[in-house]
């Protein structure tokens, strides 16, 4: 044990003895769910760093929703329902586009080379400012 560990343990024991940990907010309540619980332990810290930097938002979830909506549109026979699905797809696509723009994914020169290929692959119109 190093000196800082001993001092820390001593302060914690003193606080427990003085009752400083009694009646804390949230006492007896479950901890909030860990949003990185589905990831392996070795990736969690990196995920949290990316999330705190605003780089690991729900992009994957939006992409999954878009794929699901595409499949539903393919199988849909009711015109009203199809129109609702198409409208929902447009909304989700706009959210995804905003998220990608927020990240500045294609603002770096190294990635600008692949920009048009990515847009072609996704079947989206190329932005006018290439």
Swiss-Prot record:
Matching InterPro entries: DnaJ_C_subfamily_28, DnaJ_homolog_subfam-C_membr-28
Pfam families from the UniProt entry: DJC28_CD (PF09350)
Superkingdom, natural source: Bacteria
Protein name stated in the entry: Uncharacterized protein YflB
Organism: Bacillus subtilis (strain 168)
């Amino acid at each position: 044990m190093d000196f800082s560990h001993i001092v820390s343990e001593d302060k914690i024991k003193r606080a427990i003895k003085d009752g400083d940990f009694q009646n804390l907010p949230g006492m007896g309540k479950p901890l909030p769910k860990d949003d990185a619980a589905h990831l392996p332990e070795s990736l969690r810290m990196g995920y949290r760093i990316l999330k705190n930097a605003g780089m690991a938002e729900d992009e994957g979830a939006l992409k999954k929703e878009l794929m699901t909506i595409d499949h539903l549109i393919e199988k849909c026979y009711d015109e009203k329902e199809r129109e609702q699905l198409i409208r929902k797809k447009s909304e989700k696509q706009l959210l995804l586009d905003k998220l990608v723009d927020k990240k500045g994914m294609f603002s770096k020169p190294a990635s600008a080379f692949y920009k048009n290929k990515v847009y072609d692959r996704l079947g989206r119109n190329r932005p006018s400012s290439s």
